[in-house]
Amino acid sequence: MASAGTEHYSIGLRRGNSFKQRHPSGTVSASPSEKPSEVKVWSQAHQQVKPIWKLEKKHVGTLSAGLGTSFLGVPSQPAYFLCPSTLCSSGTTAVIAGHSNPCYLQSLPNLFSNTLLYRRTNVRQKPYQQLESFCLRSSPSEKRSFSLPQKGLPVSVTANKATSSTVFPMAQPMATSPTDPYLSLAAAGENPSRKSLASAISGKIASPLSYKPMLNNNSFMRPNSTKVPLSQATDGLKPVSSPKIQPVSWHHSGGTGDCVPQPGDHKVPQNIATVLDDVTAPITPSIPSTLNISTASVTSSQCSQSNFRMEAHPCGLDENPDSQSATKEVHFTEAVRKLAEKGLEKMPRQGYQFEQACFVNPSFQWGLLNRSRRWKPLMGQRFPQEDIGLDSAILPGTSDTLGLDSTVFCTKRISIHLLASHVHGLNPSPACGSAVDPQVLGEDRAPVPPSSLQPLGVAEVATRLSSVHLDQPGKEPEEAKDLNSCTKGGGSATDLQPNQVEPEDTEDELGDGLEDSCSHDENEEEEGDSECSSLSVVSPSESVALISRNCVDLMSKSLPNHEKVVRPALIYSLFPNVTPTIYFGTRDERVEKLPWEQRRLLRWKMSTVTPNIVKQTIGRSHFKISKRNDDWLGCWGHHMKSPGFRSIREHQKLNHFPGSFQIGRKDRLWRNLSRMQSRFGKKEFSFFPQSFILPQDSKLLRKAWESSSRQKWIVKPPASARGIGIQVIHKWSQLPKRRPLLVQRYLHKPYLISGSKFDLRIYVYVTSYDPLRIYLFSDGLVRFASCKYSPSMKSLSNKFMHLTNYSVNKKNTEYQANADETACQGHKWALKALWNYLSQKGINSDAIWEKIKDVVVKTIISSEPYVTNLLKLYVRRPYSCHELFGFDIMLDENLKPWVLEVNISPSLHSNSPLDISIKGQMIRDLLNLAGFVLPNMEDIISSSSSPSSSSGSSTSLPSSPRDKCQMTPEHFTAQKMKKAYYLTQKIPDQDFYASVLDVLTPDDVRVLVEMEDEFSRRGQFERIFPSRISSRYLRFFEQPRYFNILTTQWEQKYHGNKLKGVDLLRNWCYKGFHTGIVSDSAPLWSLPTSLMTTSKGDGTPNSASKSRKKSASEGTTLSSEDRSTPKSKKSQAGLSPISRKTLSSRSNENTSKQSKRSTPGLPVLKYSGQSSRLSAASASQSVTDSRLTAVSS
């Protein structure tokens, strides 16, 4: 990277000028030039001003101390270097302003004849930011020395007829995130005469590989699809070519600060220049209607030994027609690209805002962009500061609550034609007053009320920057009429109650290291076109049109905010006294906000692999990002080692199960399925091609290889994804040696459509392993190979023919995308489109779907013993785990489904309307199905204060809900006896298992309530286990599970009449039975009477169960289904003599306890930090009644 004369240039400050310092009270006092202190101030400042490319923090401290305490209150933001233009008069005033205590410099000396002032602080803000709209942001910054980019154009600020100052953001590209390219853009160029300054913007923007593209439906994501008209101004900007800047070096001239151009290798940075002209001052929160933007550039003719001149020349749209054709694409400089690739450390977030000045810096512009954020007066508001003790007042409309680092881009590489619009100010006077208005800064000025503030929206200003078409300035597209549909619909993550500041400062918009590249655990498989990996295959020439077509078109169809359907923030249970769950909406829905005490609990833990589509969905439900480990509710991230699950609290959910790699790794999957084949026969488990794991099975593979000489084999790394390392071979010599591999028989006769092979991506969601609950999403993806299939051995090396992975075939020039989810075209279809296609061919697609369900259930069951044991060992509560699997299934010529592999992290990358439609709906339904619950605040505190569970203990962790149940010892013992009784029968039959529903325990009711509530939230998911036919799968479990027996029998009994089953459970929940509140009317399960009285073994388990069922049903069926309150004698009709004796002996001492439990008062339901007593006539009850019809469907 070229330097700029670092060793030969110094800066000095001329005496005779003075500072205006702002006191903590907010007033501005002028320091006359005749004051003796003025000499001392300038003398100290002169000693401390150093070359701007070598400045360090220590220089700033001394300079700040010399200039007064006003400098110490400026928070860290992108640094600006201010110096006056040569056009400046003695009245020139420059402003360095941040969030607090701006410094005003009056009567600065000429530009290069004396000074260039640099100011930098190390205070870092942690702004609250909206989650839904972000994609890219720098990680928490670290300090590093300045590096100068190769090219840059200086930014000049000129106040018309009044003031002039110059701002050089020379270090800004390095000091801020690489995601701030918009903020470093401005207009620069030259006219045909080369004597005045041009008015076009040109440059380059790059997207470092560590950043990921994002789908977002705000207008930043629509640079090509939206055409925003210029405002009703008569003059504006013209695009012209960039100026040619002669190389110079700045030579040290005896400490005077004079700049002498010298020939050499050092080049003046071509920074982008922007001049604001005719701006009303001071800048108020009202929307100005005019901003005349012109440009300033540096040319060789303006360089001299004593002065380096800069001139500003406003240029209108009608002045130079030849210049309009010279617009160029904007790209990053090579220096920035190299820095991004090397992964250099990032500077702290820095920046200054201009309060009441003519120049609006990018940080202030970005603050104005946030329409979704409520604009509040921040006068006197305190901000956390790390290194200073001064808290300063902030004027309304000047607070950059979002910061520069939250710039949003949906791009692999974006080319932008940028034009700043020309807007008229509300102030009728065209003149711009002094850059500093003492009346505005005076302490007697009242803050502007929020109602009078009208900041520009994020979409509105962003579109003006990125989407203006010069050739059609007068057209107003329909898309531009509603530019903030995403940001408003998603809600703001920073909306607070009036006059309330959020107490937590430990959250951030992105988790640690979100920008890092995807990593893979040795025991996991990160599959698909991940958000991180997609950058590597994009050519630099891809433009906005491609990005807009691939990932924005569908998002732009989102309804305007006022047309969106308003949804409640919580989904109420079908049952009384059951905690509601959080609702996740679609992009056409607007989710209501919870009260502050509940909304403050909505925290999400971000990961480097959290898909953008998940971020958008949780953002619409007003989640924020937390860096703490104890307050977040959900996380979508990497799989981790099983002992790591100990750290998950009882109120938290992670999108993985421990041990799920048993089917996620290809070698483990084969081991488990081959074990099932040996136990139950190949007829039941013949849906996975025969495989061999090398090097262990090398001898078996050699034997199979020799027996079928014409067989094709496919070689796969056991833990790879996206088609990496896969090859098709037919010779033994082609087999890779000395590394783990899975060698699998190749399905050489696949079912073809239009001559091409294809596979199905099926989305399988497991909410629980014990009891096992499996859901299948009704839609999916059909992925075609981009070359027609040929069985010839000569074509085995053609991956476009034999592999169907999208990440492989998208590199083929013949690959055709499909934007229509209903069309059978291109190389990617919707699964429902395939079923329609096959139905038109006379094929029974329902039969294929049923076969797919069968293989999915069997595959999940093959991993069940491992996962269940690890859950009991390392997970505190079953609630804490859930997982989405991606099954890759291929149909052979007989339409038999074959499982190729299972992905534990299926790709959710959405680069087409088809992906957005299917995956977006699937994620929304999945999160609703997961049942996120707002915890009690005391539960969070207790879990965080409890000793760490990551110790070496190997004992099972407790399950919170069960431990909190307050049951009598009799019911607790009876519950255990019932589970043991149904698990110890060696030859169970259907009648025996059916008796499990005769007497329900509190645990039974709780599990069944969870299952029915979950089913009512299923959306487009279909539950395939338990189901009415799932009893046939019970024999495949390595060990019988009591709750699997219970849920299967429940489905068999009530699948045709769900309302009856739900009504039965509602009756128990009304009494609080599922929470352990047991009244005297509740039946108590006991061993069958025949089993207790038969001591000689003449009774069988089956006969005993039948006799027990006959006796027990008399008391329990009536009490549950008829909703009557049975007598205590009747409730004991089915009990054994021992149980009756036990109950009678303790009846006296339990009378008082039972009377308290049976009081008519309803139990208190606690959730989200508040307590509410439910009643039968509550509002949630009406919601429950309206959803009962959905349960029966």
Curated annotation (Swiss-Prot):
Enzyme Commission code(s) on record: 6.3.2.-
Alphabetized Pfam families for the sequence: TTL
Residues that bind Mg(2+) 2: E901, N903
Signal peptide extent: none
Tissue: Highly expressed in testis. Expressed in brain, heart, kidney, liver, lung, muscle and spleen. In the brain, expressed in ependymal cilia, the cortex and the striatum. Expressed in blastomere.
Main location: cytoplasm
Any Gene Ontology CC annotation: microtubule
Annotated positions binding Mg(2+) 1: D888, E901
TM region positions: none
Residue sites binding L-glutamate per the record: R783, Y806, S807, K828, K919
Region (c-MTBD region): 913-1027
Domain of life: Eukaryota
Binding site for ATP: K716, R722, G723, Q744, R745, Y746, L747, K757, F758, D759, T804, N805
Single biological process term from Gene Ontology: protein polyglutamylation
Catalytic activity from the UniProt record: L-glutamyl-[protein] + L-glutamate + ATP = gamma-L-glutamyl-L-glutamyl-[protein] + ADP + phosphate + H(+)
Subcellular location: Cytoplasm; Cell projection, Cilium; Cytoplasm, Cytoskeleton, Cilium basal body
Enzyme class: ligase
Cofactor: Mg(2+)
Site (Essential for specifying initiation versus elongation step of the polyglutamylase activity): R722
Sequence positions bearing Phosphoserine: S686
Biased composition regions of type Polar residues, renumbered to the chain: 24-34, 1092-1102, 1131-1153, 1183-1193
Sequence ranges assigned to domain TTL in this UniProt record: 599-942
Function: Monoglutamylase which modifies both tubulin and non-tubulin proteins, adding a single glutamate on the gamma-carboxyl group of specific glutamate residues of target proteins. Involved in the side-chain initiation step of the polyglutamylation reaction but not in the elongation step. Preferentially modifies beta-tail tubulin over the alpha-tubulin. Monoglutamylates nucleosome assembly proteins NAP1L1 and NAP1L4. Monoglutamylates nucleotidyltransferase CGAS, leading to inhibition of CGAS catalytic activity, thereby preventing antiviral defense function.
Family to which this protein belongs: Belongs to the tubulin--tyrosine ligase family.
UniProt free text on domains: The flexible c-MTBD (cationic microtubule binding domain) region mediates binding to microtubules. It is positively charged and becomes ordered when bound to microtubules: it interacts with a negatively charged patch on tubulin. The presence of positive charges in the c-MTBD region is essential for proper binding.
Protein name per its UniProtKB record: Tubulin monoglutamylase TTLL4
Organism: Mus musculus (Mouse)
Organism placement in taxonomy: Eukaryota, Metazoa, Chordata, Craniata, Vertebrata
